[in-house]
Structure formats: C-alpha cells, structure tokens
C-alpha cells in the first residue's frame, strides 16, 4: 500500500478549532514538520479538510 508524506506548510494560528484538531490528529505539531501516513480513506479525508495548510507527496512503501 502506498504511503503519503504530509508536511505542515502553513501555521494553524487563527484557524478554526476543528482544523487545529485535524492537524494534531495527523501528527503534525509545528510548521514544516512532516509525517508519513498510510494512504487510506480516513487519512485522505483529514488531509482534504486541511489541504490549504499542508503539502502531500507520495513516497515508496518500504
């Protein structure tokens, strides 16, 4: 299964609480922090909710 590298590129300051919680649930803490997640429906939904704050790259599943 493919994996996604998600990077927080914009700050959550001034964003609604739901977006802050979604970023936290993805495992992102500070700007420019990255996590590698499984490519599944749940993660895709969270990424879509905060797509204006993050960048997503597909990485090889090793």
Curated annotation (Swiss-Prot):
Q: Is Ribosomal protein included in the keywords of this UniProt record?
A: yes
List the GO terms this entry assigns under cellular component, sorted alphabetically: cytosolic large ribosomal subunit
- Matching SUPFAM superfamilies: Ribosomal protein L30p/L7e
Task: List, alphabetically, the Gene3D superfamilies matched.
Answer: Ribosomal protein L30, ferredoxin-like fold domain
Query: What are the GO MF terms of this UniProt record?
Result: structural constituent of ribosome
What keywords does the record list, in alphabetical order? Ribonucleoprotein, Ribosomal protein
> What cystine linkages occur within this chain?
none
**Origin, by domain of life?**
Bacteria
Quaternary structure, from the entry: Part of the 50S ribosomal subunit.
Q: Which PANTHER family match?
A: LARGE RIBOSOMAL SUBUNIT PROTEIN UL30M, MITOCHONDRIAL RIBOSOMAL PROTEIN L30
Q: Which family does it belong to?
A: Belongs to the universal ribosomal protein uL30 family.
User: Could you tell me which HAMAP family the record lists for this protein?
Assistant: Ribosomal_uL30_B
Could you identify this protein by its name? Large ribosomal subunit protein uL30
Q: Which organism is it from?
A: Staphylococcus carnosus (strain TM300)
Upper classification of the source organism reads: Bacteria, Bacillati, Bacillota, Bacilli, Bacillales
């Amino acid at each position: 299964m493919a994996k996604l590298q998600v990077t927080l590129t914009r700050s959550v300051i001034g964003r609604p609480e739901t977006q802050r919680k979604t970023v936290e649930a993805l495992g992102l803490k500070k700007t420019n922090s990255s996590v590698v997640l499984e490519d599944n429906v749940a993660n895709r939904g969270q990424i879509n909710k905060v797509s204006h704050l993050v960048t997503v790259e597909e990485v090889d599943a090793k």
